[in-house]
Amino acid sequence: METDPILKRWNAAIEAIREAGYIVREEWLEGGGGLCEFGGKKYFFSDQALSLFERLDQAEEAVKTLKMKGKIDE
């Protein structure tokens, strides 16, 4: 059985975020989430209150941001 294209995109984005040194957390945030740094650590929070499509958009936007900052290769 082949993996759904949306899940492939999700997995690729999360892998890229992790490779950039971010800890990925999936939490119920009521509409929040994204990249942040505190306590000397880097985090990506994915809001489980959002739909998979919204979470995917959030993750892919984080990847774009990391690419713009040079933390992920193109």
Question: At which residue positions do the language-model features occur?
Answer:
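His/Glu-rich zincin catalytic helix
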Residues: 28, 47, 67
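An anion-binding catalytic pocket shared by soluble metabolic enzymes
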Residues: 41
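Short alpha-helix carrying the canonical HExxH Zn2+-binding catalytic motif
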Residues: 55-66
